[in-house]
Amino acid sequence: TREEAHIVSPGLERPMVAAALGGSPSTPAGGLIAEVVRFPDMTALEAAPNSAVVGRIVFIDEHMSRAQDGAGYGVAVRKRGRCAPIAQAKGAAACLIRAVGTDTHRFAHQGGSSRQSQGASLPAMSISPADADVLANLLGRGAVRVRLDITAEIRENAQSGNVIAEIRGRERPEEIVLLAAHLDSWDMGQGAIDDGSGVAIISAAARLIRDLPRRPRRTIRILLAGAEENGVHGGAAYGRAHASEAANHIVALESDFGAGHVWRFDTQFAESALPYARAFQRALSPLGVLPGPNQADGGADVSAMKELGVPVVDLSQDGTNYFDHHHTPDDTLYAIDRADLRQNVAAWATFVYLAADGDWSFRAPAAE
């Protein structure tokens, strides 16, 4: 695969650190050269007349804000998914986006880009924050042309799979506490924080519980999902395969936000079960975990079960620095703090054991 981007004017040739986005087609052989038009965000692109875009490379120069809960990602990632189809509809030649991350390194961030329903799309690349700054500065002085050269191939779907393991409950094995993480990662790094750390956290927590003298009353089930990064296929497959068991799933949760320390406990319980949420938080408090809102997301790989009515919780991790590494060559073991990882395991083991060994239900009582 070739994924190259060069500034070729005014009067210079400067390589940029770039990565072709997932789903991007190839450029024509030898690449394409076009003038760049900059937009500060997707709203500006959507409002632009077609005449401002036709034949040009659209550059979305939106910065991502740093936040403990990662809230800036939901805003910034929109350009990665929507630049290509919107720019294509306006007649653009290609898309460039400022990397969806909070770092200032010369690393491009990888990730998926949407394709039009008929399968056509535009070449789309992410460029590093440093290169985005240079390009923006040059555009402030006048016209800039860029050459993009991508060779990419969209292959047929291949077989993936999930790994499922259980600690059978000693009294009510049909009742399930579901723990999830995903096995796949993007190609640029090691996948240590996305999501090797999640796999390690839930596996280590389950092992601690398994090694106790007495198993909990309910079954603890681990789902290590495949094919999350290209569409949450593993989690969706689990939902289809276990839909008939949804009523027996007591609660579900996923670790898929790196290895920053768990700082908040969020729930999505029925109003009648909120006293249980407060009891869990008190148990987690010695680990530095604060109470959170009753608005938990649960995680992508348990979303199918959530849609079937399964209560979810979030052991919310500190994501202040997560997007410095996310989907980049910097996603390595170096980015993981051992003390934070141990605190995650302790928090997961605490919640999961209590949820699996108690009699509580987090759903609304059945109507009589």
PLM ranges: what are they?
Residues 79-80, 84-87, 163, 175, ...:
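Alpha-helical metal-binding/catalytic segments enriched in His/Glu/Asp
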Residues 13-14, 34, 122-127, 132-133, ...:
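Metal-dependent peptidase/peptidase-like ectodomains
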Residues 207, 211, 218, 323-368:
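His/Asp/Glu-rich mid-to-C-terminal helical/loop segments that flank catalytic regions of hydrolases
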Residues 52, 84, 88-93, 97-144, ...:
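Loop-rich non-cytosolic ectodomains and luminal regions
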Residues 1-16, 97-116, 160:
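Protein/peptide-recognition domains central to ubiquitin and immune signaling
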Residues 38, 57-61, 93-98, 124-126, ...:
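Structural recognition of the beta-strand scaffold that forms the well-ordered cores
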Residues 1-3, 128, 159-184:
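Acidic/His- and Gly-rich active-site-bordering loop/insert found
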Residues 1-57, 61-69:
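Noncatalytic luminal/extracellular "stalk/propeptide" segments of secretory-pathway proteins
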